[in-house]
């Protein structure tokens, strides 16, 4: 429902009509329930106006995602049947809506993650057509975020016929990013010049004074998205009431997002603490289940960097205390291979000037993960494992029983 995916779909449909292509394409929309009404109306319009060219997959399945605004309910499930009375929006009722009762997906597991579903959908779609080569067109742009830039431009990926805007996902499945080099201004120039449909929530963003670069359509409780919580209150007050009631901590996130309370601003170390002691103090304040998740992640984080060492440039090595580190004088395989592998004798409390880099281990980085309520530890370069997903689902069931 966002500006980028909308533009990409319009371009594809125009190409198909101009060249007389009649074979339908699958169009996946993953409905996360807690979204703007205007987004749903835009999807409805795009689907209904183009049924001659598309196979609509409007997915309203229960899936797990993070709730970065609460330590006590760190995950939530959109379209959770047990919470139907609290759904932010009623489930749409078109024939092409896919829900728990009618879904055709052999890979779907109850309460799997959004990311896992999106990754597996392409393979499933390809199997419906005899395992032929399948192109998954993804409407992302490299200048939107570092993660998106990395997805498009990383050097270690396999591509389709050396096309830089493609990535091989499996033997016959490839992702393509046809507008990856577009800028935000290009998106709106295209919409205006060719009079294309777009999500009208962007008009409200503009009237609310949101800069073009900050206009994002996403569910409101995630690690990065919580900064947009307050916009629900401004743009769709009737939706905001349900957003607040849907998960624990939503109004706290709205009030305190962007403050020290959520780790968004510069954090000063409390008097009498080191970052190590502060990290251990913060862990003691957490609910036991949440504390165990962080502790497990931190142990893996520490062991990983102790084992492989950190890639450090010669100029950065000069900044390090020689009594703290062992310089192996070997070149790291990470990055360009032009940095030396350095191992720390003990975990440094803080590394001034280096803590914002992902290749370094410090107690401050672990503290910041807790303060940002980053329970999946993405700021420490972790991704969610299948084992963790299953554990999350156990926690969700436990918290539901407690509520």
Predicted features, each with a name:
Residues 5-403:
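Nucleotide-activated chemistry modules centered on ATP-dependent adenylation/adenylyltransferase
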Residues 2:
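Conserved G/P- and acidic residue-centered "switch" motifs that form tight phosphate/ATP-binding loops
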């Amino acid at each position: 429902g966002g500006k980028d995916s909308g533009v990409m779909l319009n371009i594809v449909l125009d190409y198909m009509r101009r060249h007389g292509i009649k074979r339908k394409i699958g169009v996946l929309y993953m409905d996360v329930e807690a979204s703007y009404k205007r987004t749903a109306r835009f999807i409805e319009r795009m689907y209904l106006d183009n049924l001659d060219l598309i196979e609509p997959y409007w997915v309203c399945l229960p899936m797990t995602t993070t709730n970065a605004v609460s330590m006590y309910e760190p995950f939530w499930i959109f379209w959770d049947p047990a919470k139907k009375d609290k759904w932010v929006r009623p489930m749409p009722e078109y024939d092409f809506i896919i829900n728990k009762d009618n879904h055709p997906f052999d890979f779907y597991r109850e309460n799997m993650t959004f990311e896992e579903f999106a990754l597996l959908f392409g393979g499933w779609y390809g199997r419906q057509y005899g395992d032929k080569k399948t192109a998954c067109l993804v409407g992302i742009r490299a200048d939107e975020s570092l993660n998106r830039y990395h997805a498009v431009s990383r050097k270690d990926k396999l591509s389709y016929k050396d096309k830089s805007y493609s990535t091989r996902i499996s033997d016959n499945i490839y992702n393509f990013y046809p507008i990856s080099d577009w800028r935000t201004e290009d998106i709106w120039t295209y919409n205006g010049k060719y009079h294309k449909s777009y999500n009208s929530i962007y008009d409200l963003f503009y009237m609310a004074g949101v800069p073009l670069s900050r206009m994002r359509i996403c569910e409101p409780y995630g690690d990065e998205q919580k900064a947009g919580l307050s916009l629900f209150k401004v743009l769709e007050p009737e939706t905001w009431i349900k957003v607040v009631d849907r998960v624990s901590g939503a109004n706290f996130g709205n009030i305190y997002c962007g403050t020290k309370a959520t780790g968004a601003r510069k954090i000063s170390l409390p008097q009498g603490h080191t970052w190590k002691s502060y990290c251990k103090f913060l862990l003691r304040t957490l609910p036991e289940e949440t504390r165990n998740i962080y502790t497990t992640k931190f142990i893996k984080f520490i062991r990983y960097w102790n084992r492989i060492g950190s890639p450090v440039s010669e100029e950065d090595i000069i900044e390090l205390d020689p009594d703290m580190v062992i310089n192996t004088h070997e070149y790291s395989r990470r990055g360009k291979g032009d940095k030396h592998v350095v191992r720390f004798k003990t975990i440094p409390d803080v590394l001034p000037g280096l803590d914002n880099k992902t290749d370094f281990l410090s107690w401050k980085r672990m503290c910041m993960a807790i303060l940002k309520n980053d329970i999946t530890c993405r700021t420490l370069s972790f991704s969610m494992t299948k084992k963790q997903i299953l554990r999350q689902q156990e926690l969700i069931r436990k918290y539901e029983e407690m509520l």
